[in-house]
Amino acid sequence: MPAKDIKVALPRSQGHWSNADILRLLECMENNLPYDDNGTFSSTQSHMDWGKVAFKNFSGEMCRLKWLEISCSLRKFSTLKKLVLEAKKCVKNTNKSQKGRNHPDFPKRLLTAYIRFFKENWPQYSQMYPGMRSQEVTKILSKKYKELPEQMKQKHIQDFRKEKQEFEEKLARFREEHPDLDQKGKKSDICKRVQTKVQKKVQKNIEEVRSLPKTDQFFKKVKFHGEPQKPPMNGYQKFHQDSWSSKELQHLSLRERMVEIGRRWQRIPQSQKDHYKSQAELLQKEYKVELDLWLKTLSPEDYAAYKESTYAKGKNMAMMGGPAPSLKQTDPQSSSAKGLQEGFGEGQGLQAAGTEASQTIWVNCQVSMEPEDNRKKDGEEEESSNSLDCSSGEDMEVDV
């Protein structure tokens, strides 16, 4: 159960119970539990001597009522002893997670340029459209922000940068004045186990790569002259490609630009998403036709080199756990291919793979690039998750 649930479960009538009092109550209950507590939760609870649990000004009946309030949010398929220990852990974690940000001196979180514009104009637009849902008003405001002149946008951006600098200075002073509060909460054991497994798998893959012979072209891919460039695989990738070079996003860092593009994708209507999807599908069809025609222009030697390069890439992807790319088999000796190849003299056509090939680092990405539907729209840079992921089963290449 999340730590915040315990606090929510406490009504106003029991507000005089501090976290320290709740911990004391749970400790008293723990001390009065039977040593071999193997009974059900309800059975052990019914035999609890609440008179022995009472402490300070809290009577046994008050302790019993308080425990009933706390246990409302706890799972019941366990022994009473385990539930008491679980409740203690939740109360302690509540103290750790909230004592920093709930501190009166902690600086106020920043608002991005868009969120600042949103808050300033929300009252006006909510009155203009009283019968409209909040989500629809948000879409209108988002559209208005996009239509703002560049000069007005720059004003919001400059205000944000100025406040960001002030926030960082205040945060640095806060950490100096309260070093005991500047401690990151420990992750749960489950997160640590998952992280350890991932790290072990990554380390294993790295060791396998390092053990390959020096001649292995694992991180190299031959770029053949005239080879068609792969288009976006889906609607979101097409939208991302179009938005990446937008002038209004150039002032953002790479990470912020990725996050903003993901947010914009969530705000556009479904009809526009379908439009991008159709564009991506059309580009994929054109790419397949161009690739097929290009393969027919290759000499038998170049076709074999291209096939070997693609096969090596698929083998390496499979070793890293990714899907192997498919290569449509085109017979270079077909009638159409022969007609195109007759004009090739010795030394013409494509040069050897090693002569003009530029080295490319291939990064295999297994997760979907599409942002989650339930992504938060709070606009806080520091707490944005999103990260931008790579397309499913595809590669991103960076020329070096």
Curated annotation (Swiss-Prot):
It is found in: Nucleus. One of its GO terms (biological process) is transcription by RNA polymerase I. The keyword Repeat applies. Keywords: DNA-binding, Nucleus, Repeat. Residues 327-338, 356-367 have a biased composition (Polar residues). One of its GO terms (cellular component) is nucleus. The keyword DNA-binding applies. GO terms for molecular function: RNA polymerase I core promoter sequence-specific DNA binding; RNA polymerase I general transcription initiation factor activity. Residues 320-400 are annotated as: Disordered. Residues 107-175, 229-295 bind DNA. Its main location: nucleus. This is Putative upstream-binding factor 1-like protein 6.
